Amino acid sequence: MKKRVWILTAALLLAACTSDEQSTKDVETEQSTDVVTIENEGITIVSEQAPTRAITVNQHATEVMLALGLEDSMVGTAYLDDAIYEPLQEAYNQVPVLSETSPSKEQIIETEADFIYGGWASFFNEKKFGSREELQALEIDTYVQSSSMKIAPTVEDVYTDIRNIAKIFRIEQRGEQLISQINEDIDTVTAKIPNTEKPLDVLVFDSGETEVYTAAQSFLNTLITMVGAKNVFGDMEDTWVIVSKEDAVERSPEVIVITDYGSTTAEEKIRFLKNDPALSQTPAVQNERFVVIPLTAASEGVRIAEALEILATGFYPEAF
């Protein structure tokens, strides 16, 4: 199944590029006459022409750009959480990597960027490369993934971001093609999910030693629900929360989803859970039911079908 999702995505990219080559004149006409105005998290973006020197910060934003075939419009990227999505690797290799973490304001200016697309609003501040207002004063438009700012974001929220980026770059048709393909891939995965009398109780383990940092009403909660399971902390009014080990044990998770990113490996997290006096008492640990998911796949980007497949395969191995 995973290979099928990858093949379909790669085929879409090839088709999108071919389609754009055939309609270059139409795109150029649209770019020269249309002014795009988008409201984005308190900032009004007024784009008189498609950006040609874009920078992405945060991997799920980078992968949206690459899935739309916009690598030639990029002058830099920064901050990977995990391995780049396989069908996008070749396109990613064509983009200069400015930093493994956050690029500096000086790096941004040196690239002569005209657009910055960030996955998280937290990167737009004085400690990193400047506020959105400051960058706007430098004639650098910015866009923050709105779906990453919401409590309980939906797949449609992600599609709104994809449509907005496609609109800014004047490639609306390509954006709709990508959304259509993601929907097809989602249907391919969810069609195999069995009906169950009781949803599996799932705990997300991101990190923590004395407490547990876990998903509440984040996009990962949305994904878990889409495959027919229940996030045991999905009733909390936030995206990610810190809870006590005792509370996690009391909710008796049957499966633990491990977010995989950064310097602490998934194997190390699983080892910690097995050795922890409290968390090792959960049914999930005692039955060694762990599902590892790359953080970017669980984020508000283009890897929704891959994320659903990973979760469903771990939850219902007999069906996959």
Language-model features: locations:
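Short helix-initiation/N-cap motifs at beta->coil->alpha
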Residues: 40-42, 95-106, 236-245
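Proline-aspartate-enriched helix->loop->beta-strand connector
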Residues: 105-118, 244-261
